[in-house]
Amino acid sequence: MKIEYFGHSAFKIVSEEGLIMLIDPFISNNPLCSTPVETIDADVILITHGHSDHFGDALEIANNSGATIIATAEIANFVQRQGINAIAMNIGGTVSINNLVNVTMTDARHTSSIDFTEEVEEGGSATGFVITLESGKKIYHAGDTGLFGDMKTVIGDIYKPDIALIPIGDKYTMGIEDAAIAAKWLQSRIVIPMHYNTFPGIEQDVELFAKNVEDEIIGTMTVPLMPGEDYREE
C-alpha cells in the first residue's frame, strides 16, 4: 500500500492489489506540485467537494486514464455532463470498487460550490472519505473541514481508521490545535497532515503540529510528507 502526496490535499493511494485512487487531484495549478498532470494515471478519482483547489484536474485525468469519478450526486451530475463516467453517492453511503476496495463517504464541515465554471454551480455537501483496502486497513481523508463531533463518535469510534489525512492550514479549515484534537479523537496509528503551506493564509508549522500530536496521543505517529514523497506499508 502506498500513499503519495502531491501537496495541498491531493493524494494518490495505491491499494495492496494495485488499484490506483486519486483524491482531490489539484495538480497543474498547485504551486507545491511539480508532477505533470499528463503523467498521472488512475482507476478511480474521489472528489471531496467542488472547489477548484480540490476538483482540480479531475476531468483531464479521467479523460486521459479512463478513471471513474466518485463524488456527491451534484458533482457527479456535473462530471457526467462533461462526458466523464461518474458514480454518485452521499454521506453514510458505501460503494465497492471492483469488489476490492470499499469507499464510504463521510461528513465534513465546509462549503462545496463548483466555483470554476462560468456560473457557479451547487456542489452538494462537503465530504470526506473512509477507504477500506483489501486487507481491511482503513484510510480516512477528511476533506476540507473544521473540527466536529462525528470525527470521534462516527469516524473514530465506528470506522476506526488506521491512517488519517487531516487538514491543518487554518482559515478555511481547522488549524493545528483543532487538528490535534481531531487526531486524538480518531486514534489512528498514522496521521498525515494536509492543506497547509500552499497559499498565503494557510501557512503552518507542521513540526509543531507533529509535536502536539505525539506529545498528547500515545500510539499515534505523525508523518508529514513533502510533495512527491510517499508513505508505504506492507
UniProtKB/Swiss-Prot annotation:
Keyword field contains Hydrolase: yes
Alphabetical list of InterPro entries matching this protein: Metallo-B-lactamas, RibonucZ/Hydroxyglut_hydro, UPF0173, UPF0173_UPF0282_UlaG_hydrolase
Keyword Cell membrane: no
Listed SMART domains: Lactamase_B (SM00849)
Entries under SUPFAM superfamilies matching the protein: Metallo-hydrolase/oxidoreductase (SSF56281)
Molecular function terms from GO: hydrolase activity
Keywords: Hydrolase
Pfam families: Lactamase_B_2 (PF12706)
Family recorded in the similarity comment: Belongs to the UPF0173 family.
Matches recorded under NCBIfam families: PRK00685.1
Alphabetized PANTHER family for the sequence: UPF0173 METAL-DEPENDENT HYDROLASE MJ1163, UPF0173 METAL-DEPENDENT HYDROLASE MJ1163-RELATED
Descriptive protein name: UPF0173 metal-dependent hydrolase Msp_0516
Species assigned in the record: Methanosphaera stadtmanae (strain ATCC 43021 / DSM 3091 / JCM 11832 / MCB-3)
